[in-house]
From Swiss-Prot:
Protein's UniProt keywords contain Cytoplasm: yes
Name of the molecule in the record: Sulfotransferase 1B1
Similarity comment: family membership: Belongs to the sulfotransferase 1 family.
Record-annotated active site: 109 (proton acceptor)
Effect of substituting residue 145 to V: Reduces Vmax with p-nitrophenol as substrate; binds to adenosine 3',5'-bisphosphate with a dissociation constant (Kd) value increases 4-fold compared with wild-type; binds to PAPS with a dissociation constant (Kd) value similar to wild-type
Highest taxon above the source species: Eukaryota
GO cellular component: cytoplasm; cytosol
UniProt catalytic activity: a phenol + 3'-phosphoadenylyl sulfate = an aryl sulfate + adenosine 3',5'-bisphosphate + H(+); 3,3',5-triiodo-L-thyronine + 3'-phosphoadenylyl sulfate = 3,3',5-triiodo-L-thyronine sulfate + adenosine 3',5'-bisphosphate + H(+); 3,3',5'-triiodo-L-thyronine + 3'-phosphoadenylyl sulfate = 3,3',5'-triiodo-L-thyronine sulfate + adenosine 3',5'-bisphosphate + H(+); 3,3'-diiodo-L-thyronine + 3'-phosphoadenylyl sulfate = 3,3'-diiodo-L-thyronine sulfate + adenosine 3',5'-bisphosphate + H(+)
Native source species: Homo sapiens
Entry-linked Pfam families: Sulfotransfer_1
Binding site for substrate: 107-109
Residues at which 3'-phosphoadenylyl sulfate binds: 48-53, 131, 139, 194, 228-233, 258-260
Keywords annotated in UniProt: Cytoplasm, Transferase
GO biological processes: 3'-phosphoadenosine 5'-phosphosulfate metabolic process; biogenic amine metabolic process; epithelial cell differentiation; ethanol catabolic process; flavonoid metabolic process; phenol-containing compound metabolic process; sulfation; thyroid hormone metabolic process
Length: 296
């Protein structure tokens, strides 16, 4: 039986060729064998791409914008993370999902080929939120500073190198976004961009409402936009992850919800780092139609 000391600040473990958070890798057989339900709604993202934001949006849509219903529990209970396992600390994502009534919202950061086959077989609806790689790398670095489930990130310079070579949890950002983009050709996947959501939340949330086959009026839509704004969510203890023990997430090092903007990477990248990043990006993304904006 693993204890917290066995999983905190440990090296990543390979799972079918992908680097994975040590704590999550210990539970892989259960994750692979997970049974989906046909009406499950999957939220998939690469880490630090707006997952909690879109999770709360979808929960509000399913509850017709009823804020009181959305206060029924922490985001980790309402929208469990499939692969989340914290031995000796709290309920796993799978255990929580098994308790939740349908339609369940399932959060995951898994690449397409690690997602349990059951989700594909049941033709579950999926929403993928993608964010530009430069902002993701900066946000991920700060996340790994405060998240003790991850290996210590080292300096920003060291971390950026790991990010560019896919030596971070869940592997390469490039592989992740390209494979999910390709998968939408054969599966019901709504592919959204973080930057579009920041720029025009009303239009993007309308896309989610249509995809989920809901019909909500403008008053409810405006309520959802307000309740899920970064400023409101940052101060909402049900969604800002301050409910997790400080042994897991130390908000004194960096808050879970840090800035929620597009373009913050410019405060961290040197000219040389930016040039190197752009060269690698061009090579990796040359054969895809995916288009990202690094600022709004």
């Amino acid at each position: 039986m693993l204890s917290p000391k066995d999983i905190l600040r440990k090296d990543l473990k390979l799972v079918h060729g992908y680097p994975m958070t040590c704590a999550f890798a210990s539970n892989w057989e259960k994750i692979e064998q997970f049974h989906s339900r046909p009406d499950d709604i999957v939220i998939a993202t690469y880490p630090k791409s707006g997952t909690t934001w879109v999770s709360e949006i979808i929960d509000m849509i399913l509850n017709d914008g009823d804020i009181e219903k959305c206060k029924r529990g922490f985001i980790t209970e309402k929208v469990p993370m499939l692969e989340m396992t914290l031995p000796g600390l709290r309920t796993s994502g799978i255990e929580q999902l098994e308790k939740n009534p349908s339609p369940r919202i399932v959060k995951t950061h898994l690449p397409t080929d690690l997602l349990p086959k059951s989700f594909w077989e049941n033709n579950c609806k999926m929403i993928y939120l993608a964010r530009n790689a430069k902002d993701v790398s900066v946000s991920y670095y700060h996340f790994d500073l405060m998240n003790n489930l991850q290996p210590f990130p080292g300096t920003w310079e060291e971390y950026l190198e790991k990010f560019l070579t896919g030596k971070v949890a869940y592997g390469s950002w490039f592989t992740h976004v390209k494979n999910w983009w390709k998968k939408k050709e054969e599966h019901p996947i709504l592919f959204l961009y973080y930057e579009d959501m920041k720029e025009n939340p009303k239009e993007e949330i309308k896309k989610i409402i249509r995809f989920l086959e809901k019909n909500l009026n403008d008053e409810i839509l405006d309520r959802i936009i307000h309740h899920t704004s970064f400023e409101v969510m940052k101060d909402n203890p049900l969604v800002n992850y301050t409910h997790l023990p400080t042994t897991v997430m130390d908000h004194s090092k960096s808050p879970f919800m840090r800035k929620g903007t597009a373009g913050d990477w410019k405060n961290y990248f040197t000219v040389a780092q930016n040039e190197k990043f752009d060269a690698i990006y061009e090579t990796e993304m040359s054969k895809t139609a995916l288009q990202f904006r690094t600022e709004i």
